[in-house]
Amino acid sequence: AGQHWLMTLRLRPVHGQLNDGGFDSQRYALAQHRPLSGGIVAASALDARCSLRARYLTSLTRRLQTYPWRAVMLGLGMGERLSLPTEIKVLMQNTGTSHLMAISGLHIALAASLIMLLLRGVQYILPGRWIGWRLPLLAGLAGAVGYAWLTGMQPPALRTCLGLAVCCALRLSGQRWTACQVWLCCLGAILVADPLAVLSQSLWLSAFAVAGLIFWFQWLPLPAGRWRWPWKTIIALVHLQAGVTLLLLPLQLLLFHGVSLTSMAANLLAVPLVTLLAVPLILTAMLVHLSGPEIVESLLWLAADRVLAVLFWGLRRLPDGWLTLDARWLWISSLPWLLVMGWRFQSWRHSP
């Protein structure tokens, strides 16, 4: 990657097969800004030097040769999913955890948060006039953009950076916006910057998930209780995952023609392990790989590898939960939305 080539190409517009229920390759290609397909007739290298990202990726690949879960670590850290074994891809698809392998909001927001917390911690030793919230906020945004570039600036990563930039601008403006207004502003900014994103399934999955969570926490919030840690954290995680699982059913059925019956259990295991352990360890190891002690880097990679081993051990113990459904189930899958609204309005008290 990063090389410059002079090529003679034979190109044609990309097209799909138009099979009902099949994968729409034309829509996917246009969403990825690849409207043409074809073959190479002749090629000659103008500049054979690889980009900085490609050299860093090559160095990481050599460093991880001895770890069993190196392909997953490269996928989580750099967004490289081509080397993932087919078995792992099928397992994550059947358990509804494929979203964890995409460099999107989860990873980039986590990287930005780590940079913000690091800079905020450094401010404790600085004079009072140098302490403020704006510098860590902007540093987190810059770190998010840098990490997105390092992972290849894929469309989901680019959309996340645009959303973070909008949120930072709103925060710096000092105005108070509701969650729905922020959601609409971020979605509008993404579509203005990339109109072809309207064809992307990943955009609508992300947007629908965020809208569903806003709806879930506003219409069916977790009741205040006297739970203590760790039960309070566990109940909050179950409440969050239940909302995502139930409210995304209509869109999953519409896009993928099926649902995963084990997705909630799988995500209850996978999301904490990946978010709180695997990804922070991988990001720290990637940073230490640049100049840190080799023994520290080895320990970080080993810890991340063992966390992933535990994760996939648990996922393999789950039954095959993928259930193929047709469009007749679409209205039934919308019942969670209707039930939440009915509960909120207490409509049974007013019904005859």
Name what the model sees in each region.
Residues 1-4, 40-48, 52, 76, ...:
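N-terminal secretory/membrane-targeting helices
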Residues 1-99:
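Membrane-interface helix/helix-cap signal primarily in integral membrane proteins
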Residues 38, 88-264, 329-352:
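Hydrophobic alpha-helical transmembrane segments in multi-pass membrane proteins
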Residues 46, 50-51, 79-87, 151-157, ...:
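Hydrophobic alpha-helical transmembrane segments
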Residues 53, 57, 61, 231, ...:
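Membrane-interacting alpha-helical segments
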Residues 67, 72, 157, 241-257, ...:
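Hydrophobic alpha-helical segments of membrane proteins
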Residues 295-352:
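C-terminal regulatory/interaction regions
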